[in-house]
A protein has these predicted regions:
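N-terminal ligand-binding lobe of clamshell/alpha-beta domains
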Residues: 1-236
Length: 236
């Protein structure tokens, strides 16, 4: 069957395309310039989406706002709601999405979990500094490649942190993804100066926080980055 889909989730858009399902529209953050855009993940144009008469709109509990999902539902637009909070949740969530769009899902193959590689903090924002919390997809990826995440205690999924506190935790690695904040070399140098004895590494943010068809290869790539740090001294 052919399902007319609008995806408001960048990870889902990438996954659908990998399955040869071309969305009728997506968000401007999906990095698909050839597809029509219907706003952003937090500010979708619900009227434009409804006008497309989709069979299904893919949303995510964390990525998208509840009020936008409710507005679409009130207009009679069918929703497929995803909630991926860990690497282990990916196969089940993708199986449900594949069923909703009528495709046979390719198997999700993850590399074996790795032994202890030390500790890490993964930053996601600057001004204020924010890090991944323990109960997030990205933190579960780090655990899978052998890095215990030590950003902060508590239930906050994206806690505010200060670099002095990060330094006190003495992480072996500080991970700087290219999104949602576009960390670059100048930020790496800034953090390296304040968190001595840690490797501060820039990584493709999609590999850390986008789940879906890329998950297996993303875990492999991130593991390879960490392998490259073995035996290397942190830059001073």
């Amino acid at each position: 069957m052919t399902v007319r889909v609008v995806s408001l989730v960048p990870s889902a858009t990438e996954t659908l395309l990998a399955w040869d399902v071309v969305p009728a529209a997506c968000t401007r953050f999906c990095e698909q310039p050839l597809l029509p855009h219907v706003g952003g993940t937090k500010d979708p144009d619900v009227q434009a989406i409804a006008a497309l008469r989709p069979d299904l709109v893919v949303v995510d509990r964390e990525e998208n706002r509840k009020e936008d999902a409710e507005a679409l539902a009130a207009m009679g637009v069918p929703l497929h709601v995803m909630n991926v909070t860990s690497l282990q949740a990916v196969p089940g969530e993708l199986h449900a999405l594949a069923g909703a769009v009528g495709v046979n899902m390719p198997p999700v193959t993850l590399p074996p979990a790795r032994a202890d590689r030390g500790t890490a903090v993964a930053m996601i924002w600057r001004r204020p500094w924010m890090a991944l919390g323990a109960d997030t997809y990205g933190a579960s990826v780090l655990r899978h490649i052998g890095l215990a995440h030590v950003a902060a205690e508590g239930d906050d999924r994206y806690p505010e942190v200060d670099l002095a506190d990060v330094a006190r935790r003495k992480p072996d690695v500080v991970v700087l993804p290219s999104e949602p904040y576009p960390f670059a070399e100048r930020h790496r140098e800034e953090i390296a100066a304040k968190v001595p004895n840690a490797h501060v590494v820039l990584v493709d943010g999609r590999d850390l926080v986008w789940w879906g068809s890329r998950s297996g290869a993303a875990v492999q790539r991130l593991g390879s980055v960490m392998d490259g740090l073995r035996g290397a001294r942190p830059p001073q």
